């Protein structure tokens, strides 16, 4: 059969909508077209995928290849579609069986040698994949991040050949076993503050009652120091909230913070940030 459909995920803020990579091989002069609103990095995947397939000792089909990234109205950006496109071409050309395609999602960048490279902002995709009850095949470099999502089968690979062997059933990929999570205990504590009894009492009342709190005074009196200790008074995040915070860090490429922590985040914008709205919400040119 010369038509194959592979599942992957796009990046849209902290959302990860499903993308179906539809690959069709037809007769005619050899050509390679990608449609479905692809950005520049996605268009460039044609060269990466071709080289990866050839260097992995597969046969690149000398036919007219049309790839549709559906839904077509959703913008596609980044290199995360490389693996799904390659698997779709191999499946449509009969070099990889289609039996297990529906049970998996594929996300990863391909090197010219066929090696798998990690991508940014994977955690929202892993969360969405878990909701759809599919296994996720990714680069080993993304395995720890994806494993933060419970009830998700994470299948890390280092090369396109490993993914092919898994699809054939010869050498199934082993599910990633995350190491025990060590939660951060370095949060500033209110008992470290000497003095400021009235301010500390105000923090306790605001934390227990869920009230807003305004701290004002001359520079150097400890306003930021006190505010940074408010998360230590608040209840821990539940699992869904912790994953949402980690997803935001993942999208912001703060990989050092994209970990499963139950501590509530603390943000401290500069005092001059109120001059413009973009300083608070981001954006601009």
Label for each model-derived stretch:
Residues 1-228:
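Peripheral, non-AAA+ core regions of ATP-driven protein-machinery
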């Amino acid at each position: 059969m010369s038509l194959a459909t592979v599942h992957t995920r796009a990046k849209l803020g902290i959302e990860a909508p499903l993308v179906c990579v539809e690959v069709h091989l037809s007769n005619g002069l050899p050509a390679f077209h990608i449609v479905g609103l692809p950005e520049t990095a996605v268009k460039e995947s044609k060269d990466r995928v071709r080289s990866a397939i050839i260097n992995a000792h597969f046969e690149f089909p000398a036919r007219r290849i049309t790839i549709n990234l559906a839904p077509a109205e959703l913008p596609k950006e980044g290199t995360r579609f490389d693996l799904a496109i390659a698997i779709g071409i191999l499946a449509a050309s009969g070099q990889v069986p289609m039996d297990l395609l529906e049970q998996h999602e594929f996300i990863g960048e391909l090197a010219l040698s066929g090696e798998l490279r990690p991508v940014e902002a994977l955690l929202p995709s892993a969360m969405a994949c878990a909701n759809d009850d599919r296994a996720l095949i990714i680069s080993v470099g993304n395995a720890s991040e994806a494993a933060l999502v419970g009830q998700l089968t994470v299948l890390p690979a280092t090369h396109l050949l490993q993914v092919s062997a898994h699809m054939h059933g010869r050498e199934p990929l082993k599910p990633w076993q995350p190491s025990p999570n060590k939660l951060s205990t370095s949060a500033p504590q209110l008992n470290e503050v000497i003095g400021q009894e009235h301010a500390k009492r105000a923090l306790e009342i605001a934390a227990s009652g869920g009230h807003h709190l305004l701290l004002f005074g001359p520079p150097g009196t400890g306003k930021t120091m006190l505010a940074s200790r408010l998360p230590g008074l608040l209840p821990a995040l539940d699992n869904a909230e912790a994953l949402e915070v980690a997803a935001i860090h993942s999208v912001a490429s703060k990989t050092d913070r994209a970990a499963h922590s139950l501590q509530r985040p603390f943000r401290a914008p500069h005092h001059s940030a109120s001059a413009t709205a973009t300083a608070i919400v981001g954006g601009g040119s």
